[in-house]
Amino acid sequence: MQENLLEKQFLNHPLYAKIQELKALNLACNFSLDDSVNLSTNSQAKDEILTITKKLKPWRKGPFKIDDLFIDTEWQSFIKFNILKPFMGEISQKCVADIGCNNGYYMFKMLEFNPAKLIGFDPSIKYRLQFELINALAKTPIKYELLGVEDLPNYGLKFDVIFCLGVIYHRSDPIKMLKDLKAGLNKNGVVFLDTMYIEDEREIALVPNKTYSKIPNIYFVPSISALKNWCERAGFKEFEVLATKKTDENEQRKTEWIDSFSLENFLDPKDKNLTIEGYEAPKRVYIRIKI
């Protein structure tokens, strides 16, 4: 029911019609990848593309380059992708899901590793529209579902590899989320997950009072030991830490493509090792878990 409602709202969105008009032009496009997703069309639709992209702000994940238009997104998402890139060989000829896929940046980047199938899940109309704009030009076989992680167990297709990046701390029941990820896997499937974490040897999690780094929907920020316990309780047998990284103002910053504040405004101005609330500043752990 929720999916049908979101799909209806998406299809009735005025920008969807504009994107379909652009798609109908069937513009020749050279699609290439480096740190940004690059689309070269040399078309006469540049003004229309600029208008649509501006109306689709904020652009969080990226960057994207469409001809001479550079969408300088809030996150330099290639930094996260490059952390995971040494492990991307595991998606070759595999059925892959990206849970919380935002506008599809990571999925576009994954194409160079030749997955057999690539499906993104995110119940956000705005992010789906951003994806549809890029894909109207790129013409990739990526599929985008207006669904959340809770829809995985009954989706009807199981995955060899699932990416779930920057989602778990937004969930009020992280173990349930991990169980949903497990239910979406094929036998011998693998999950790549990242989360903010706290430095502590104990099996504990930070439960922010109202906000964490000015973000209201952060429920739990675990220690790595606590995260491992969550994964084991959800039924995962293998837990491997791939990397850790502190989030800095090079990776996340305010640009003209967002109309709100960013990391520099979320940290204590006197001590960048603390959030504005006095918690540890954001840092992330990247893990690979298997059943």
UniProtKB/Swiss-Prot annotation:
Matches recorded under InterPro entries: CmoB, Mo5U34_MeTrfas-like, SAM-dependent_MTases_sf
CDD domains the record matches: AdoMet_MTases
Keyword Coiled coil part of the UniProt annotation: no
GO biological-process terms attached to the record: tRNA wobble uridine modification
GO molecular function: transferase activity, transferring alkyl or aryl (other than methyl) groups
Catalytic reaction list: carboxy-S-adenosyl-L-methionine + 5-hydroxyuridine(34) in tRNA = 5-carboxymethoxyuridine(34) in tRNA + S-adenosyl-L-homocysteine + H(+)
Transmembrane segment boundaries: none
Annotated residues for binding of carboxy-S-adenosyl-L-methionine: 61, 75, 80, 100, 122-124, 149-150, 169, 284
EC top class named in words: transferase
EC number: 2.5.1.-
Residue ranges of coiled coil: none
Pfam families per UniProt: Methyltransf_9
Cited NCBIfam families: PRK15068.1, tRNA 5-methoxyuridine(34)/uridine 5-oxyacetic acid(34) synthase CmoB
PANTHER family in UniProt: TRANS-ACONITATE 2-METHYLTRANSFERASE, TRANS-ACONITATE 2-METHYLTRANSFERASE-RELATED
Role played: Catalyzes carboxymethyl transfer from carboxy-S-adenosyl-L-methionine (Cx-SAM) to 5-hydroxyuridine (ho5U) to form 5-carboxymethoxyuridine (cmo5U) at position 34 in tRNAs.
Subunit structure: Homotetramer.
Family: Belongs to the class I-like SAM-binding methyltransferase superfamily. CmoB family.
Protein's name according to its UniProt entry: tRNA U34 carboxymethyltransferase
